[in-house]
């Protein structure tokens, strides 16, 4: 794959108070590498507090198409991720898309 077709995007959203991640970070960062020609998330990272949460969210995002927005991805996050940072993750994804 031609790396010139890949662009790094990041979105940040405030975390709810009282959760572990908010004690370490005040915001969550969601960072994605997007193939802009194919409109697909090639790689993802985030600043959730635990390795398993980061791994789950990143694996969920990788390979997803953003051609029609992030609504379907947000719905999948809503279904699969039942942590307190769910709304912040979805907000960060929407910021990336906008």
Predicted stretch roles:
Residues 14-31, 36-98:
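Active-site- and interface-proximal helix/loop "cap" or "latch" segments in soluble metabolic
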Residues 1-12:
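Short, compositionally biased leader-like segments
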């Amino acid at each position: 794959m031609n790396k010139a077709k890949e662009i790094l995007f990041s979105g940040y959203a405030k975390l709810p108070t009282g959760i572990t991640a908010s004690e370490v970070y005040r915001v969550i960062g969601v960072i994605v590498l997007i193939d802009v020609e194919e409109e697909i998330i090639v790689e993802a990272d985030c600043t959730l507090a635990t390795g398993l949460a980061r791994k789950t969210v990143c694996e969920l995002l990788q390979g997803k198409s953003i051609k029609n927005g992030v609504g379907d991805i947000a719905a999948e996050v809503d279904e699969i991720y039942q942590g307190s940072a769910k709304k912040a993750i979805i907000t960060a994804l929407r910021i990336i898309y906008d």
